[in-house]
C-alpha cells in the first residue's frame, strides 16, 4: 500500500519509521510519503493561510497550496483524497478494514480554523476521529493511518494478531494474562492454563461478550448474538 500525507508538519510522521509500521516499510509492504503543503504555495513569504472573509477568529488554509499539492501527488498516487475534519464520517474499525483494501490513499491534514471551501472539490472523503478538537489534522491522521496499515496483508505476522483485538468483530477484547501464574495473590483463570484450546476459545468469547455489554453497551446493542454466542454465555454463567 502507498500512502501520501499532505501536511504542514511532515516531521511529525517520523513515528512511522519505528515498530511494526517501520518494519513493514523496510520490507516494502508499505510506502508512506509526506508532502509539505508549504512547498506548493505561490506566496513569496511562504504563507499558506489568510484571514477569513466575513471576519472571525483564526486563520484559514488557502485553497491554492492545497489544490496544487493534491494535483502533484495525484500524478503518481491515484487513491482517494481523504481530509481529516469534523464534518466527516467518524472513524471506526469497519472503516479501517474498508480502507485497508485500497492500494493507494492520500491524506490531507488541515490546520488553523480549517480549509478554504473551494479545496473540497478535490477531496473524496472526510473522516473525523471523534467529537473533540485537536491542534491539527496530523493528530488525527497518525492513529488513522496506523489503524489502516496494520490491517494490510503482511504487516502483522498473522491475521490472528488483529482478528481477536477490540472492535475488529464489533466486540471488546477478552482479558490477557502472562507469567507468573500468580501475582499478588491473584491467579490466572484455570482454563487458560488447561491447554484445552476449545475451552479457552469459548472462555475468551464469553468474556468478550460480557465486557462489551458492561462497558460499551452501545457496541453490544449493535452486535448480533448468534445461537453459539448464547450457548457460550449460558454455559459460562452456569460455571459461576
Swiss-Prot record:
Domain of life: Bacteria
Subunit annotation: Homodimer.
CDD domains cross-referenced by the UniProt entry: TrmD-like
Protein name, as recorded: tRNA (guanine-N(1)-)-methyltransferase
Cellular component GO terms, alphabetical: cytosol
Family listed: Belongs to the RNA methyltransferase TrmD family.
One of the record's GO molecular function terms: tRNA (guanine(37)-N1)-methyltransferase activity
Keywords assigned by UniProt, alphabetized: Cytoplasm, Methyltransferase, S-adenosyl-L-methionine, Transferase, tRNA processing
InterPro entries on file: Alpha/beta_knot_MTases (IPR029028), tRNA_m1G_MeTrfase_C_sf (IPR023148), tRNA_m1G_MeTrfase_TrmD (IPR002649), tRNA_m1G_MTases_N (IPR029026), tRNA_MeTrfase_TRMD/TRM10 (IPR016009)
Reactions mediated catalytically: guanosine(37) in tRNA + S-adenosyl-L-methionine = N(1)-methylguanosine(37) in tRNA + S-adenosyl-L-homocysteine + H(+)
Organism, as annotated: Clostridium botulinum (strain Langeland / NCTC 10281 / Type F)
Alphabetical list of Pfam families matching this protein: tRNA_m1G_MT
Classification of source organism: Bacteria, Bacillati, Bacillota, Clostridia, Eubacteriales
Annotated residues for binding of S-adenosyl-L-methionine: 110, 129-134
Function of the molecule: Specifically methylates guanosine-37 in various tRNAs.
Enzyme class name: transferase
UniProt GO BP: tRNA N1-guanine methylation
Subcellular location, record wording: Cytoplasm
Leader sequence segment: none
EC number, as in UniProt: 2.1.1.228
Keyword tRNA processing: yes
